[in-house]
């Protein structure tokens, strides 16, 4: 395993210690493993895919008062500390900045690396674990599971 990836794993594990269960190391590890698997079949920069996947939820805005710059700042500082090249850092930060579900309507020239990490993150949102993550986050935010007084929002 590449040293930068090993250092990133250690950093992410330490940083996400005690994080909300739906956005913890185990989620990050699943996304990383899925991204690695997808990347093997694509023409992409494997290191950018792996490090982006590892850092994608390092400071999720949902848990930091909506601050969308914190993850970028933390990631950039860390990547500079481990001596990554500026061009590679820029590409990783691009993925982290644009991975969010809420950016899906935006016109954006996506890189292959961004598409891979987005797909991996979205795949982790499916199935039993994805459903469990959704309920866990709702509980974390003290949301009701169901309220018959709230009518569905039909589009």
Model region roles, listed by residue range:
Residues 31, 67-81:
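An active-site-proximal "capping" alpha-helix that borders the catalytic cofactor pocket
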Residues 46-64, 71, 92-102:
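His-Asp-centered metal-binding catalytic motifs of divalent-metal-dependent phosphohydrolases/nucleases
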């Amino acid at each position: 395993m590449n040293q930068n990836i090993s250092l990133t794993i250690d950093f992410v594990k330490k940083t996400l210690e005690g994080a909300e269960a739906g956005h913890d190391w185990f989620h990050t590890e699943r996304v990383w493993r899925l991204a690695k698997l997808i990347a093997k079949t694509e023409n992409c920069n494997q290191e950018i895919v792996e490090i982006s996947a590892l850092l994608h939820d390092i400071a999720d805005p949902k848990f930091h008062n909506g601050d969308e710059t914190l993850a970028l700042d933390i990631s950039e500082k860390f990547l500079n500390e481990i001596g990554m090249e500026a061009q590679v850092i820029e590409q990783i930060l691009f993925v982290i900045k644009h991975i969010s579900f809420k950016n899906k309507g935006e016109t954006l020239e996506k890189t292959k690396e961004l598409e891979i990490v987005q797909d991996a993150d979205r795949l982790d949102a499916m199935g039993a674990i994805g459903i469990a993550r959704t309920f866990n986050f709702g509980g974390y935010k003290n949301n009701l599971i169901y309220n018959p007084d709230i009518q569905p929002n039909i589009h």
